[in-house]
């Protein structure tokens, strides 16, 4: 399934871009599902896929309902513990949605579309309206992060020892985690794995919406770094609300000139690898299918499905006795600056922080037998140098 995720700085028109992309895909003959958290004028707002045209369905995420359903289910599964401590139950009507629940609801919706009940509906294209730019990139990194937390907190080897739990509980003097907790963790891990596979698929791309101007230029520069760190792929940058050039009105002419200068920078920085599409200002917010068609947003291109390659690579220098003299782990980070870069080696992992973005990367087996000897950020590429540890690296006789 071809998947397009739309985002951009707040107020830049990412929801409009999602709707225009979905309509273009449907018009191109693709059976399309459009997912949004915000209402879209002229489209039905049901929480189950509802037909818009013959080839286009739309569904709106209800994060409040998802939060209430999840918490109610958790209460039922933990009823034994709650009864033990004399805790009362919370009714669905009294539950108030907590911060962060919208992100979890979106991940749940992505799972339904990728591997859940909606995945059997025969959709060719999935278009998802994501939150604003920085929040969206953090959201797409969340499945990998949450799965790591689950592995650390509830490792599989402990679940395998469930027959020893009563004995261990007596020895430790504290109750061991109940079976339902491991089962719940396994279900969530499977759900997160499906979403992570969708994000990492080479047929999944991002489309960025931004209104030309200094603020958007800085936001996109930061976003390029986040895209590279997380290994995400963008297929289009839409410059939204582009004013007509050569206006006789001095005020409009000045605004258009500022936009044109910014557009020149975007074409130089993003194209041709990522095309820049200029969507005209309609003089009003797009509200109809004709308005969306007037933006002339292209339909998604065809891409082969399968896990995309990791964004990093390893370079090596030959040494003696079959042991390399040095290995260099390389990761492109366009737009990154040294002052905002933090790198920590911890065991088999690299902890990378670049500006507002953070990622923990498990290094290749060869690098686990090495020590870090240095790092440098040059020409937009982070290079981490590893020196083989003689005590761990096998020697050739």
Regions inferred by a protein language model and the residue ranges of each:
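Walker A/P-loop NTP-binding active-site region of P-loop NTPases
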Residues: 5-64, 113, 126-148
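P-loop NTPase motor core
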Residues: 39-41, 45-94, 101-104
């Amino acid at each position: 399934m071809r998947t397009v995720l739309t985002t951009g700085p707040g107020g830049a028109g990412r929801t409009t871009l999602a709707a225009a992309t979905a309509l273009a895909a449907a018009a191109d003959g693709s059976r399309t599902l459009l997912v949004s958290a915000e209402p879209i004028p002229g489209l039905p707002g049901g929480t189950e896929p509802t037909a818009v045209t013959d080839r286009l369905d739309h569904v709106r995420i209800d994060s409040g309902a998802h939060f209430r359903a999840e918490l109610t289910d958790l209460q039922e599964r933990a009823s034994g513990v709650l009864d033990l401590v004399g805790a009362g139950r919370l009714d669905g009507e009294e539950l108030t949605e907590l911060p962060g629940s919208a992100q979890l609801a979106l991940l749940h919706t992505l799972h339904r579309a990728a591997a859940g009940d909606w995945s059997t509906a025969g959709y060719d294209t999935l278009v998802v309206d994501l939150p604003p730019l920085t929040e969206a990139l953090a959201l797409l990194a969340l499945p990998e992060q949450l799965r790591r937390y689950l592995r650390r907190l509830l490792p599989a080897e402990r679940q395998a020892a469930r027959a020893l739990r009563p004995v261990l509980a007596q020895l430790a003097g504290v109750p061991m985690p109940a079976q339902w907790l491991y089962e719940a963790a396994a279900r969530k891990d499977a759900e997160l794995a499906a979403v992570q596979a969708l994000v990492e698929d080479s047929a999944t791309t991002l489309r960025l919406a931004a209104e030309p101007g200094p603020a958007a230029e800085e936001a996109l520069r930061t976003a390029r770094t986040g895209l590279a760190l997380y290994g995400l792929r963008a297929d289009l940058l839409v410059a939204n609300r582009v004013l007509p050039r050569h206006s006789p009105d001095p005020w409009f002419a000045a605004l258009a000139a500022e936009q044109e200068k910014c557009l020149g920078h975007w074409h130089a920085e993003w194209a041709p690898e990522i095309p820049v599409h200029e969507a005209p200002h309609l003089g009003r917010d797009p509200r109809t299918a004709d308005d969306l068609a007037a933006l002339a947003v292209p339909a998604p291109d065809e891409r082969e499905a399968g896990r995309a390659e990791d964004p990093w690579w390893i370079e090596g220098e030959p040494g003696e006795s079959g042991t390399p003299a040095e290995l260099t782990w390389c990761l492109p980070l366009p737009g990154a600056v040294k002052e905002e870069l933090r790198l920590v080696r911890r065991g088999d992992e690299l902890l990378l922080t670049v500006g507002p973005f953070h990622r923990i990367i498990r290094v290749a087996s060869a690098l686990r037998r090495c020590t870090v000897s240095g790092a440098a950020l040059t020409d937009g590429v982070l290079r981490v140098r590893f020196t083989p540890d003689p005590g761990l690296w096998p020697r050739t006789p």
